[in-house]
Amino acid sequence: MLSTLMQQIGIHPFWAQLLLLLVIIYFGIRFGGVALGLLGGLGITLLAFLFGVAPGKPPIDVILIIIAVVTTSATLEATGALNLIVRLAEKLLRRHPERVTYLAPICTFSLTMLVGTGHAVYPLLPVIYDVAYSKGIRPERPMAIASVASQMGITASPVSAALATVVAIAATHHVAISVPQVLCVTVPSCIIGMLVAATWSLKRGKDLADDPDFQARMQDPRMREYIEGGSHSVLGEAVSSQARSALTIFLLGIVAIVCLASVAQPLLPLDAKGQPLTMVPVIQFVMLAAGALILFFTGVKPKAISDSKVFNAGMIAVVMIMGIAWMSDTVISGNKGYITDLLKAEVERHPWTFALAIFAFSAFLKSQAATLTVMLPLGFALGLSPATLLGSVPASYAYFFFCFYPSDLATINFDRTGTTHIGKYILNHSFMVPGLIGVGVATVVAMLIAQVVV
């Protein structure tokens, strides 16, 4: 076994296993999609047969919650209810175009909070561009922060996989962190971070009239026609009664989860051990029940659900999390004592550094749920307080750092002026500063609030 050989030459096997994990993540990102999950399985195989490490535990609770939430959100999308939400957002943006730099991120953040996934915001991006350009506002200003805000809203959503991950992992470690407690920390902190980043965005870049690159593009008649192309709007699209019914049922499902997690807990049955039922299975069956009611009352076709963008993105996330989180748990659980000894002194002196570790891991993993699935158990193993771990949750969004996430790429494509861009040096892109400001401020505020809430 490689572990024995490495110990004989004075190198702890953890470092080789960590290198293998980073290599798996690198190639998983290069291939994209479900590749990260598949390669995670390959990594576990290599750890088992080359290093003699027993496989860790796959995050079954997290995976089941994601499946339940994503399926119900996909059912909502299949009824056209997402277009109803986008329609309401567009009305607000067009009514106050001069405030688009604030209203755009508020709309994308709220949309993500409502449906639990940032992939629901794509129909809103061309609307934001149209409103900004029509008002003479540099589109980069509202569009970049709108994309960032759409992902910041994930940990502030009661039906997101990331929030469910926090509750599930805390329960696994016998720590009672409820859905309302998480929301009390993440909602205000992420909103404050988003608004600070939006304020910075108000004056970013040159006005279009003073931007030489933009003015040069406008000299080309074909480019001018492309930039000033027809406006995009969903206001003229009909809204069906099915969409209204589906949205009502979905919202009632969210309210039910929040109520059962707080004031209505006595209504829940006891488990086989006579203990109060945790919120992990409750989130699963309530969301599936909401999806079933939408199915019955709207008559939406099951095939339309499985063909939806939300379902596709969610199932990719499930495979990613199963493979890479399982491999990460294998590395961590197989070397827990060594890792704890290595990091405990520093983390005890400066607990906030754990948030930096979460941020760094997220930049590569590109999933808040997957990042929290890997890092929170390590935080508990290091003896960090629940308040510190909960305060670190907003730091799980760092995949704006390398600008290759679908929502960021879509934002760049929808900005026909070219002001929202990936820079020459890759890291100097439009999302870097608003992302760092938004996540940084949100994490600091969350750390402060968590000390009171938990």
Model-derived regions: residue spans:
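Membrane-interfacial helical/loop segments at transmembrane boundaries in membrane proteins
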Residues: 1-2, 167-172, 268-275, 340-346
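Hydrophobic transmembrane alpha-helices of multi-pass small-molecule transporters
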Residues: 1-73, 213-329, 433-454
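Membrane-embedded alpha-helical segments and adjacent helix-loop junctions characteristic
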Residues: 27-29, 38-42, 48, 53-142, ...
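Alpha-helical transmembrane segments
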Residues: 61-70, 182-197, 275-287, 388-402
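Helix-loop-helix module between adjacent transmembrane segments
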Residues: 70-74, 104-120, 145-158, 186-194, ...
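Membrane-core helix-loop-helix motifs of multi-pass transport proteins
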Residues: 129-224, 233-245, 385-395, 410-454
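Membrane-helix interface motif
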Residues: 158-171, 262-270, 327, 331-336, ...
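Terminal transmembrane helical module of multi-pass membrane proteins
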Residues: 368-369, 402-403, 408-413
